[in-house]
Amino acid sequence: MTRKIGLTLPQRGTFFDVLSLSELVETGHWADETGLFDSLWIGDSLLAKPRPESIALFGSLAAVTNDVTLAVGCMASFPVRDPILFAEQWATLDQLSAGRMLLAVCTGIVKPKDASAREGAPYGVSDASRAARMAENTDIVRRLWTEEDVTYAGRYTSFENVTVLPRPVQSPPPVYIASNPVPEPLATRALRRVATLADGWMTTRKSPEHLTVNLPAIKEFLVEEGRDPDTFPVSAYHNLNLAPDREAAYEESYRFLGEYYGPVFSREATRHWTATGTPEQVAADIEQLYADGATEVTLRITSWDWRRQLDLLVKEVIPRLRPS
C-alpha cells in the first residue's frame, strides 16, 4: 500500500494558547492547499476531555478543504451518542465534503478512569458497556447508511423502520477502530474486534514493539475472517517536536501532553509516542513506524511554537519521507 501522511490539529490547544479556533480551521485550509497531506485529523470527547465539538468543527473543515480526507481519531464519544442522529450527522458531513469522511471509533475509556465515567454518567453509559455499545453503534450506523426502513433490536438501542437521508457519498464511509495496548485477556479481544468490525486500525506507539507485536495478531484474525491483511489500513497516530536539542524537545512534549490530557502519560510512554530532535532524527523515527507496518502516520506537533514547527515539518521532514 502507498504510504500516507496525515496532520492532526491540536484541538484542545485552543484551551491553552497554542492557537485559536479560527486559526485551527485556517490551518486545515492551508494543509489542504499544500497538497502534502493525505488526511486531516481532529479528536473527540464531550465531557471527559473537553474540546471544540468534533461534528460542528468538521462542518467548518469540510467547507475550507477540497482534497484531504477528514478523519476523527478517535470518536471517543461514539458509545454515548445516539446512533440514529450520528448516522445522519456523518452522512451530511460526507455530503458536504464530497465523500471525504473517515470515522475512527473507540471505547472512549480514558485515564484517569473517572473521566470517562463522568462523561458516561449523564447518558447512563457505564465504562463496562462502552465496548459493546461501540460495536452495536457501528453496526447501526453502517446499516442506516446503506439500507432503507431499518429495524433494529439491540442490547442498547431498538427502533423500527428508520431511513436516514441524505445518504453519504461513500457507501458506506469507512470505519476504523482505534485501540492501544491493554492487558490480557482484553488485548486479544480488542485485536479480534478490529479484524471483525473495522475497515482499518488506528493506534499509538506506547512501546517500541507495539506494532510489531499486535499487527501480526490482527492479520491472523483478518485471514480467519476471509479478509486480505495486505490491503488493511493501519494508521499510527504520532507526536513530533523539532529542535536541535533532542532532550529539550522531549521535555516540551512532555509538558505539552500534560496540558493536553492531564498527568496521565509516563515519561517513558511519552518518549515512545513522540518523534523528537532534528528533522533527520524525526524523519527516521517516523520511517520506523512505516517499517513496523503502518500504512499511514498522522502527526501532531507537541510544541507551543506550533506554527514554526509546522513550517519545518513541511519543508524539512516531509521531503525526507517522500523523496522526489
Residue map of PLM features:
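Alpha-helix-loop-beta-strand connector modules within alpha/beta enzyme cores
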Residues: 52-72, 133-137, 314-324
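Hydrophobic faces of well-ordered beta-strands that scaffold small-molecule active sites
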Residues: 3-9, 38-42, 70-73, 101-105, ...
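Flexible, glycine-rich active-site loops centered on histidine and acidic residues
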Residues: 2-19, 79-151, 209-216, 304
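Acidic (Asp/Glu)-rich catalytic clusters
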Residues: 29-34, 58-67, 90-101, 192-196, ...
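N-terminal beta1-alpha1-beta2 module of alpha/beta enzyme domains
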Residues: 1-69, 128, 172-174
